[in-house]
Curated annotation (Swiss-Prot):
Its main location: membrane. The lineage of its organism: Eukaryota, Metazoa, Ecdysozoa, Arthropoda, Hexapoda. Cell cycle regulator. This is Guanylate kinase-associated protein mars. The modification Phosphothreonine is found at residues 51, 519, 826. The modification Phosphoserine is found at residues 49, 76, 170, 444, 554, 785, 792. Belongs to the SAPAP family. One of its GO terms (cellular component) is spindle microtubule. Residues 193-208, 273-285 have a biased composition (Low complexity). It comes from Drosophila melanogaster.
Length: 921
């Protein structure tokens, strides 16, 4: 609500709608109190015992009419003698309970009817211009607007009717032997004849039990002053307090200071026997010697003297909350005649005059029951609305001087750090405030105190050299709020004025001087429209953006003339029209500048070709300003016509008649800005050419790049020579090859009847090695057909073939022993069909290395056979699968050493029958 502080007028707390929840709670509280009170009354009379019955309320009211301030001693003895007889007669046990109930009901009904009539008369009220003297008759029950007794005549006092209490009241008496026995001597008051006012009664030492025993004879004393409902209006009570503020007389009691009027009331209403009326009788003439005080207020209802609060459990004995040890103020001597007790208490106790009010000790009270009506404290709004002088008070409040608005952030108080409980402490005397500040109505509660001179203790605590240094003002955030316009004169009088002038004095104090009451002026227009794009956010976050949107909408406070959307559209029109005019003016100035330059330097520009660049840029700029921007100007006019309703065309669905919104103007302007920036880049390029004397600034003379020197290859580098077989090895290979041919010629047919194999060139050439990169222990089989390549395609082909042939020869003569069978192999698995896989020699086999020993083939043939065992077995396996030979029986004994019988090996999970290599090579 801080950002809306200046936008809306403030309402009073009593009339504001904030009291709805409190009002509901007060209703429930009043209902509960009424229920408890009804329960109490129903349970009081439980039998037809000789319980003392109080006198009729009407008779008590008539008696109190003429004897308001008279003690019970002034009554005639005949009347005192007849009262016990009447009470005994009324409480006769022979009377049936039904008759008593009917009698009480009829009395209650009569009192209720009178109360309703008085309430209706009070609610209707009198005219505003009725003279004040007649208000006691027109509004007989009004406690707020009745005439003070010191101004009314005796005839009006006698004619003023008294009221009946709305509820049944207690018959019990209050005896206070402890408090009354300690009445001290009076101190010297400012009023003459003070001793008679404070004379203690003669029966102060009576015990509580004796007072209760004689409560029948004192019943008239308790009923002389009936309770009247207090009208608890905070506004009216505040006016009363400000209008008539008497300085009371003071007498010393045990724990508190009392006013003379309250003393008289206390003595009148709480004495258990009707004898000590001389105190009041002696006090009254002494007070009447003072001249009456005539009020100088205008013709508003004149309030009475301040009345004291009444405790909820006692009907006619008021008490107050102790206010502490405050010294009595005896500056003014205008004493008002004490008023009769008319039911104080309620909300009026909150508005008592604290400067001159006295306090009574709450410890003297004896709480018995609650007879206070709770509704007096509640339903403040309804009670205020029913006041007859409400309009007059509101007009009077509107014409009062309004206190200045004191913003905390604009005032520097040098005593903020030194303040403890309060910032501004003063004496209890209001006269000192008047001397120091003059009119206290316009005193700001937070402004620095302006004292006369340097006598203040706080100011002496300040360092001497310390002065208010005007530091740099911090940069404030962007504020979207704006003042509203008050149209009616009533609002002008009620709106607080935010315009103030700060006056700097030589002493360093800053004083706020309020200006004249007037409506804050609107923001002065400096030619810039009040527009912010709806697509632009100057804050971060969803919550901040939402608050920013609310502030932006608060720009356009709706009034009676135009709604919010219209004002927003008009602001957009003004903004974009101004932006468009500025942009067109700027671009046209650039075109004129370059045209003048091209005419002055036409020869140089034609020589270098720069005149064409200038003409192209100027042409694009004029095309933009005369076409696109003129079209945008037409859209702005259409948006304004749609918002104001002037020169607007009906929407027939065509492009020319569609309504244009502020968001459409925003999008168009963004597109125009892109084209305008493109034109600006062209003008910047012209400036670059102009600075380079119309030579291409990007065409820099590039130096020929020297190629990087390649690394020289030295002819002395060692080239790996291919391994050449030694002469002994060549001879060995030739010999082995010849022996192989001889062996094939001698064996034309195979033992098993298969056709003889073809020559070595037609048979598949198989090389089996281990792949060193593979983790599997299985051997890699390389198979190459004869027709795919020559035998001498590899440098070691001759060597390999010779070694394999020699190994086959040795294996044919002496077969190697059977190797161990792996424990991971299963012997009884069925034979799977083998698939020949052709591997690339370059990928799988990187290098072949055969271990051999020269000369050991012929001498020790077993060594070579053992070293080439892996190669021999795998080669035999591949040869057996490729040749498609007959399958041998796996169950045949594998221990047969005959050459014709094939060997059986276990490979992985199957058995493989191997035939001798001599059949293939």
């Amino acid at each position: 609500m801080q950002r809306h502080k200046e936008l809306y007028k403030e309402q009073s707390l009593v009339l504001s709608p904030r009291n709805h929840c409190q009002e509901n709670r007060d209703r429930l509280q009043a209902a509960r109190a009424k229920k408890r009170e009804d329960c109490f009354y129903q349970n009081r009379i439980i039998s037809v015992s000789p319980t003392p019955v109080k006198i009729k309320q009407l008779a008590a009211a008539q008696a109190a009419l003429t004897q308001e301030n008279v003690a019970p001693k002034l009554e005639s003895p005949e009347r005192l003698d007849t009262k016990p007889a009447e009470l005994l007669k009324e409480s006769n046990p022979k009377v049936s309970r039904q008759k008593l109930y009917l009698q009480r009901y009829m009395e209650w009904k009569i009192a209720k009817t009178k109360e309703h009539k008085q309430q209706d008369q009070k609610r209707r009220g009198a005219a505003i211009n009725v003279p004040t003297v007649k208000q006691s008759k027109a509004l007989p029950k009004s406690q707020t607007f009745r005439v003070p007794d010191n101004l009314a005549s005796a005839k009006q006092k006698e004619a003023a009717p008294m009221f009946q209490p709305p509820k049944r009241c207690s018959l019990y008496m209050i005896a206070n032997p402890t408090g009354k026995g300690k009445a001290a001597e009076p101190i010297k008051p400012s009023i003459p004849k003070p001793t008679s006012a404070a004379a203690p009664p003669s029966s102060n030492t009576v015990a509580a039990s004796s007072a209760l025993a004689r409560h029948k004879s004192a019943a008239s004393a308790t009923k002389i002053v009936p309770a009247i409902r207090q009208n608890n209006n905070p506004v009216a009570l505040a006016r009363q307090k400000a209008a008539a503020r008497p300085i009371p007389n003071t007498t010393k009691q045990t724990t508190s200071v009392r006013q003379p009027g309250i003393e008289a009331k206390k003595i009148t209403t709480t004495i258990p026997r009707p004898t000590p009326a001389t105190v009041t009788k002696a006090k009254t003439p002494g007070i009447r010697q003072q001249p009456p005080v005539v009020s100088t207020k205008p013709r508003l209802p004149e309030p009475p003297a301040p009345r004291t609060a009444r405790l909820p459990n006692v009907l006619s004995k008021p008490f107050e909350k102790p206010l502490g040890n405050k010294a009595p103020v005896t500056r003014r001597a205008n004493v008002v005649k004490p008023q009769p007790i008319r039911g104080g208490g309620g909300a009026a106790a909150k508005f008592k005059d604290t400067a001159g009010a006295t306090s009574k000790a709450a410890s003297h009270s004896i709480r018995m029951k609650a007879t206070k009506i709770k509704s007096q404290y509640t339903r403040l709004q309804d009670n205020v609305r029913k006041l007859p002088q409400l309009k007059a008070e509101l007009l009077h409040a509107a014409t009062l001087d309004i206190p200045p608005l004191t913003p905390l952030d604009d005032i520097h108080n040098p005593f903020i750090d030194q303040a403890t409980s309060t910032q501004c402490k003063s004496n209890n005397s209001s006269g000192h405030l008047l001397e120091a500040f003059g009119d206290t109505i316009l005193l700001s509660p937070v402004a620095p105190v302006k004292a006369e001179g340097e006598s203040s203790v706080k100011r002496q605590l300040l360092p001497e050299g310390k002065k208010e240094a005007s530091g740099p003002v911090a940069k404030k955030k962007f504020d979207f709020t704006r003042y509203s316009v008050a149209n009616s004169p009533a609002e002008d009088s009620l709106i607080l004025d935010p315009q103030q002038t700060t006056v700097k004095e030589d002493t360093g104090d800053s004083t706020l001087v309020p200006e004249g009451t007037k409506t804050p002026p609107r923001r002065e227009s400096n030619g810039m429209p009040n527009y912010l794009s709806p697509f632009v956010s100057v804050s971060r976050g969803k919550v901040n953006s939402r608050c920013e949107k609310e502030k932006r909408n608060s720009f356009y406070l709706s009034n009676e003339e135009s709604p919010l959307e219209v004002r927003r559209a008009i602001e957009s029109v003004l903004y974009f029209r101004l932006q468009l005019e500025n942009e067109i003016t700027r671009l046209q100035a650039l075109c004129a500048e370059w045209e003048a330059y091209s005419k002055e330097n036409e020869a140089r520009l034609q020589e270098t070709g720069g005149i064409d660049m200038i003409n192209v840029t100027i042409g694009q700029t004029r095309l933009l300003t005369t076409k696109k921007m003129m079209q945008f100007s037409g859209l702005i006019d259409r948006c304004e016509a749609g918002a104001t309703g002037k020169n607007s065309q009906p929407n027939d669905g065509s492009e020319d008649s569609k309504p244009v919104q502020a968001e459409d103007l925003e999008g168009w302007w963004d597109m125009l800005r892109l084209q305008s920036e493109n034109v600006d880049k062209r003008f910047d390029n012209l400036k670059r050419w102009k600075a380079n004397d119309w030579l291409d600034p990007d065409a820099v003379a590039e130096e020929p790049k020297q190629p990087k020197p390649k690394p020289k290859i030295s002819r002395n580098m060692k080239i790996k020579s291919k391994a050449k077989p030694s002469s002994n090895l060549q001879q060995f290979l030739r010999k082995a090859h010849a022996n192989m041919k001889k062996t094939k010629v001698e064996e034309p047919t195979l033992e098993d009847g298969l056709p003889a194999t073809s020559s070595r060139h037609s048979s598949p050439r198989v090389i089996v090695v281990r792949n060193r990169r593979s983790f599997s222990p299985a051997r890699t089989v390389l198979r190459m057909s004869t027709g795919e390549g020559r035998q001498s395609i590899a440098p070691n082909a001759l060597l390999k073939s010779a070694i394999l042939a020699a190994a086959e020869q040795n294996a044919a003569k002496t077969p190697p022993p059977k190797p161990r069978t792996s424990i991971l192999k299963t012997p009884g698995t069925t034979k799977r069909q083998n698939r020949g896989v052709l591997f690339s020699a370059k990928k799988s086999v990187r290098r072949f290395q055969f271990t051999y020993e020269e000369g050991n083939i012929s001498n020790d043939e077993t060594v070579g056979a053992d070293k080439l065992e892996d190669c021999e077995e795998d080669m035999s396996l591949e040869a057996s699968t490729e040749s498609g030979s007959l399958e041998q029986n796996p169950g045949r004994d594998s221990n047969q050493e005959n050459e014709a019988t094939p060997r059986t090996y276990t490979l992985r999970n199957r058995r493989v029958n191997l035939r001798p290599s001599s059949e293939f090579m």
